[in-house]
Amino acid sequence: MKPIIIDVHSHLAPGVTTDLVISALNQGVVDAMVMFARNPSTDAEVLGLADALPGRVVVGLAFQQPDWMIQQPGVLKEIERKLETGRYHWLGEVILRHYGAPAIGAPPWDLGVDTDLFRGVLTLATRYDVPVTIHHELDDETREVFRNVLRDHTSAVVVWAHWCGRAAPDDAQEFLDEFPNLYCDLAASTLLTSFGSEKNPLFIDEDQWDPDWKDLIEAMPDRFLFGIDSVVAALFANYGKWLEDYQKMFALLSSDTRAQVMGGNAARLLPAEVVADLAQVAGTEVIGSVSSTTTEPIPALTIDCSLDEAGKRISCQAGGYQEGMKLTWTSTASSKTRGGDWYNFNVSEDLIGTEATVFLEECSRGVCRTAQVVVDLAGSG
């Protein structure tokens, strides 16, 4: 069976009817959509759509609504009230800094990232174990304040819309390296049509990725999510066309990367019962899932580290980890934290002749196991 495909960035908006969503799903290979209401559409309408299309719609709790956009102080209480129902499995799209998109009637916004309200959203996302998608443009003015807020909320799973706030690839990697719970969606609507300010595009033309972006996605395939950003009815009406364009570009990625980005990563961020419903209806296999009836023992989590000949760089490789689980590396000898199955860092001069402890944590939805190893630096230098 084919891997599950989840579009993590869709919007219920005026003119987006149940029949239009059905038509969009029938135009391509997408199995399910994460759906956020865009004013004047409401959360109640998204719940109704999910009830009408079981296993096809992941209910998002909407933020493109008046109470959030005017920063109403009581908005957090309403968000928590809805989360307590257990019906909402994603938050978004939280508008923070938005350059605006006149072609679709979207004005610019700059609500600020270091606010009690946004910090409250991250706290609720952590408390209720739901991912939160944010629209926040990365630029020199916002970089450090955003970093500092994330440092205060490292347990929140944040999906940074539009390829990490349309960051340059090296800037995106810097943030992804530091924050293991940070993901980026690749939603670009129509690939090459600009609805606002053009910045660091993913694609050079309709047949070619920006090479630096492609390299980063291949290097960190567990940190990117597929989405189209169907934000108006016209995009749903032409969903098959946009999906065909995306499929062509994603075919240029390795098969493992493609499977993770197109749905495997999103599935790991959702409750198991939700993923089971999606997979059952779509008749697909979820990447990284393990059958509950398996009798195969789970191998021990291991770390294999080596010191280069000059004694200045430690290189580590994970072993025994389960596919689809979240890996996080740390060390007493480095401030660098990263995800993935490998970990490299330089040895500072003041540590030569001592030792370094490397830690690896493997987690899925709050269940974790760890491994550690001590690297002797006595021979370094």
Give residue ranges: language-model regions.
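A short beta-strand segment in extracellular, disulfide-stabilized domains
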Residues: 311-320
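Mid-to-C-terminal alpha-helical segments outside catalytic/metal-binding sites
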Residues: 1-4, 9, 19-23, 27-32, ...
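Catalytic pocket-lining loop regions of alpha/beta-barrel enzymes
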Residues: 51, 55, 106-225, 277
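Surface-exposed, flexible coil segments in extracellular/virion-facing regions
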Residues: 330-346
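Solvent-exposed segments in extracellular or luminal domains encompassing
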Residues: 341-358
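Active-site gating/metal-coordination segments in enzymes
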Residues: 40-131, 190-191
